[in-house]
Amino acid sequence: MANYGDPNLKVFTLNSNKGLAYEITERIGVPMGKSSVTRFSDGEVQINIEESIRGCDVFLIQSTAAPANEHIMELLIMIDAVKRASAKTINVVIPYYGYARQDRKARAREPITAKLVANLLETAGATRVLTLDLHATQIQGFFDIPVDQLMGVPILAEFFEKKGLDDVVVVSPDHGGVVRARKLADRLKAPIAIIDKRRPKPNVAEVMNIVGHIEGKTAIIIDDIIDTAGTITLAANALVEHGAKEVYACCTHPVLSGPAIERIKNSKIKELVVMNTIELEEEKLIDKITTLSVAPLMAEAIVRVHEHSSVSLLFD
């Protein structure tokens, strides 16, 4: 892309997802902001901004994926540095918002950590948050600053449309994901099915029943996050057992922790389509996994925010 040409737009990256950050700046046509994110000898974060940002719209790109605590602390310190350097606005771009699954008190005496993270970002000095497919949309209400939540479904829909799959059914792996599945199904002009599951303890899922017709069909399971891959692989195996012709799976955020890769390798999933909101280690880039880039979407959102244009067109 040609140079954007506005010196008042500054984009900086921290350590969690540099590949995506550089894709975004290349897409916009601006150089990456000059800064260093290092550690003191005792492990404390040291940040230095190496250019003037006075009066600029600053965008900080950082997924708060594992190690989540390290990446959150980097982001908070960077926000403080930018604020003290007299930036006009501090726009925090968080492709993957860590701690989003801790959005409510599931049991007595539990914290609501997603709200705590929101408080920390605001207190540090963030003036806007730009993110993608929050695990719980109500997290937007945890902030008293603007939150732009972009959607990954159009990217996934375009990918599957180009594959030209026949007789598709879109599957939600649980009742909570029905709205997401419906959005993909509407774009693919396909019916939906639902996996009715019971989760006896965290990261352990048991498939109980399938609601909807899947026999002889090509199933596409969609979720927002795949962590240990227990839910998605059990769902895929159950779909095949109930007569699905083949099974694809997709998600926005590939956490892929613990036994996830082995489970995916050994599952009935033909292809897992993910996005690059989280940078995957080399050993996780197996043949079954296809990665799509969110850089064009996020670059467009950044430019629109900077130019005070509407971002709502990017929400659907």
UniProtKB/Swiss-Prot annotation:
D-ribose 5-phosphate binds at residues 199, 223, 227-231. Its EC number is 2.7.6.1. Binds 2 Mg(2+) ions per subunit. ATP binds at residues 42-44, 101-102. Pathway: Metabolic intermediate biosynthesis; 5-phospho-alpha-D-ribose 1-diphosphate biosynthesis; 5-phospho-alpha-D-ribose 1-diphosphate from D-ribose 5-phosphate (route I): step 1/1. The active site is at 197. GO terms for molecular function: ATP binding; kinase activity; magnesium ion binding; ribose phosphate diphosphokinase activity. This is Ribose-phosphate pyrophosphokinase. It comes from Halalkalibacterium halodurans (strain ATCC BAA-125 / DSM 18197 / FERM 7344 / JCM 9153 / C-125).
